[in-house]
């Protein structure tokens, strides 16, 4: 039986001009992850990431720990199927109508720029609409389209894998959520309730044999918990 380890990227730069950059905390999370995996003796046959910088930087920061110990590291393969959905595009497309139909949304929005919990509230309302699929304007990647994209990436991995391989996939919370939805047949709304709980640099293990895939573990972040440093356990 083979294993795919879905690894969420480290904390990105919320509120900065460029979100797609690991914060100092995100870099530390990735380094801690790499040391933990190396200590476990977990050696990967393949390593895949999307083309987002936060995903690839998480991979490089983690595997720097392997290099320091002389452990083998496979070359990074890039597959854009594992990119996150475009949250900014979804917000731009769906926010105007939300503000006209949800009276509380405008007040939440006023506080969202500097307050992560308020941003989370408005974003959750927008995601509800995106999942419903009834508000999507032309050109916006739909939830169903996103799921199909992620599924195609998983299929490419499985087609090239044998049943003994260990494969690391450095990706994002939404991508992991889509795979949970596909593999467990969990309703999309329920899967997104779990999405909000996915910790940065958490491990989510899939077991596979041929085309059959099962969820083996979800949101494991023991590497962070062992440090007893709550500031390293982040969700955004």
PLM regions: where:
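Active-site metal-binding loops of divalent metal-dependent hydrolases
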Residues: 10, 173-174, 219-222
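Short glycine/proline- and acidic residue-enriched helix-loop micro-motifs
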Residues: 103-145
């Amino acid at each position: 039986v083979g294993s795919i380890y879905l690894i969420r990227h480290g904390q990105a730069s919320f509120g900065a001009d460029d979100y797609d950059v690991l914060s100092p905390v995100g870099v530390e999370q990735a380094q801690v992850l790499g040391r933990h995996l190396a200590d476990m003796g977990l050696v990967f046959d393949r390593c895949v990431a999307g083309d987002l910088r936060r995903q690839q930087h998480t991979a490089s920061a983690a595997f720097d720990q392997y290099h320091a110990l002389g452990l083998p590291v496979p070359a990074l393969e890039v597959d854009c199927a594992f990119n996150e959905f475009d949250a900014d595009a979804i917000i731009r497309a769906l926010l105007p109508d939300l503000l006209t139909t949800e009276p509380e949304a405008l007040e939440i929005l006023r506080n969202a720029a500097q307050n992560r919990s308020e941003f989370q509230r408005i974003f959750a309302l927008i995601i509800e609409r995106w999942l419903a699929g009834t508000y999507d304007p032309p050109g916006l990647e739909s939830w169903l389209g996103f799921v199909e994209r992620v599924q195609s990436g998983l299929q490419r991995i499985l087609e090239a894998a044998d049943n003994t391989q260990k494969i690391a996939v450095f990706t994002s919370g939404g991508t992991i959520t889509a795979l949970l939805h596909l593999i467990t047949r969990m309703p999309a709304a329920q899967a997104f309730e779990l999405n909000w709980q996915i910790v940065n640099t958490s491990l989510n293990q899939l077991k596979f044999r041929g085309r059959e895939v099962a969820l083996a573990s979800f949101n494991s972040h023991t590497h962070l918990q062992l440090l007893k440093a709550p500031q390293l356990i982040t969700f955004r």
